[in-house]
Amino acid sequence: MKLNSQDLEKIADLTLDCYNQNAEHFWEGTRYHDVSQNIAAMLQYIEGDRPFTILDFGCGPGRDLRVFAELGHVAIGLEGAAQFAAMARAYSGCEVWQQSFLKLDLPENYFDGVFANASLFHIPSQELPRVLLELRACLKPGGVLFSSNPHGHNEEGWSYGRYGT
């Protein structure tokens, strides 16, 4: 079933509302998750000299954003949920852009890496090719897009108040 623009807006709004309402609980449940292997996997494939300019796509409360900054990189977060964006700024000290994943406004050829850890699965499947092209366009030549997503059951729809694919 093809989703229209109103359906897509509703999906984004309700998912972001869920995260905004549960931001502190989510943070307490994920603050100490170790994703160092994911960070290392992306960084090892970026060519050129460090520091790299990294976009943490769906940065949440800023856990990974802070790690990139502590490693000496220029880290910028992108987050749709206002509560998470504020938390990420406070926790990481990094710049955070608040944008919907479905309405991105990204500079072209700007980032050495895009780190999309447990975030792209929130994009409805019909929109995913477009969003991936936009993420590709924001990468410098030779830039790396890293994506990791939670294991699911190959279903698209609502789960715990959030939309996922």
Annotate the PLM regions.
Residues 116-119:
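A short beta-strand submotif of the Rossmann-like class I SAM-dependent methyltransferase core
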Residues 102-114:
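A short acidic, Gly/Pro-enriched loop at the edge of an enzyme's catalytic core
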Residues 109, 137-141:
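Conserved glycine-rich acetyl-CoA-binding loop
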Residues 1-57, 61-105, 126-130, 134, ...:
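Class I (Rossmann-like) S-adenosyl-L-methionine-dependent methyltransferase catalytic domain
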